[in-house]
Amino acid sequence: MDIGIDLLAILFCVGFVASFIDAIAGGGGLITIPALLMTGMPPAMALGTNKLQAMGGALSASLYFLRKRAVNLRDIWFILIWVFLGSALGTLLIQSIDVAIFKKMLPFLILAIGLYFLFTPKLGDEDRKQRLSYLLFGLLVSPFLGFYDGFFGPGTGSIMSLACVTLLGFNLPKAAAHAKVMNFTSNLASFALFLLGGQILWKVGFVMMAGSILGANLGAKMVMTKGKTLIRPMVVIMSFMMTAKMVYDQGWFHF
């Protein structure tokens, strides 16, 4: 598939903007996947290429959070294992079953997340009581988070952040940091399976990854410096935008 320099430059910018937003609130796929589909590549290849570029951004943000000691891998290694396994299972299933019913339910889930953050203004302002241990979170919650990202994906960062705030008691910046490390883990599992299926356009993926790394690093810095004032409105806005796009794509308002 031949893609010119001008289009590659646009995709580089798309990767930058999407990963900047994704590092803060999730929802970067709302931007990158339509951009990839508009190049004319098949949907499966667009998803695989998106996982490649997203993995670069997620790794960049994760390394930044690790350097700043916002995340301790010794605390969450068990969680990450189950996120990886859940994502692998979701990626395998998405290639073999009909997801029409799930797609119709998804806008309500994403909208609920946005409304929850909107109407609980003090949620995540500071650390709260931890409701689940890391072990129980890993066993009971992580497989579903990974499965969702591998199976479908939109809003994964917001869902992971919400889980960290409500179940692990994290403040919003800490939740966003842990969500990004989990997101990298789930992306890695999905990428490996798309790689085995040959569904990656490498040139496009690497160009977008370069932009993604820069955008994610900047977004991660914003989380650490302006997290409390920035994350909540970004999560709400991205949740509403994702809901609107999914509703439109499903033809709810086509007459």
From Swiss-Prot:
Pfam families per UniProt: TauE
Family in the record: Belongs to the 4-toluene sulfonate uptake permease (TSUP) (TC 2.A.102) family.
Keywords assigned: Cell membrane, Membrane, Transmembrane, Transmembrane helix, Transport
Membrane-topology descriptor: Multi-pass membrane protein
Highest taxon, organism lineage: Bacteria
Protein name according to UniProt: Probable membrane transporter protein HI_0198
Subcellular location: Cell membrane
GO cellular component terms, semicolon-separated: plasma membrane
Transmembrane segments: 7-27, 28-48, 76-96, 99-119, 132-152, 153-173, 191-211, 235-255
Protein source organism: Haemophilus influenzae (strain ATCC 51907 / DSM 11121 / KW20 / Rd)
InterPro entries (UniProt xref): TM_pro_TauE-like, TSUP
